[in-house]
Amino acid sequence: MTLQEAIKEIISQNYKTGDIFDSHSVIFLLSRNEKYAETYMKNISPEMNIKQYHAHIAKNISFFDDCVEAVDEKIITLNIFGELSKNQVWKRK
């Protein structure tokens, strides 16, 4: 499974039309769900630190404009490290 396939599956299986979600929730599911953990790990590039990799994942969400749209607001939520940080909000189409 590619990273893009995993992200698309997470979106389609976890969010209903009209749901609003952030990139942190997708990253959490990608990294902690047994089904996607291997895909998450094998796509980490040695040239990227974890924050850069997570930004890369968040950017990949935007490629699925057939099923999500960016909301013009940013939200502050806990990231995978338990730290508050701003991130993109998405709406499921």
Report each predicted region and the residues it spans.
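Phospho-regulated, low-complexity intrinsically disordered regions of nuclear gene-regulatory
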Residues: 1-14, 24, 29-93
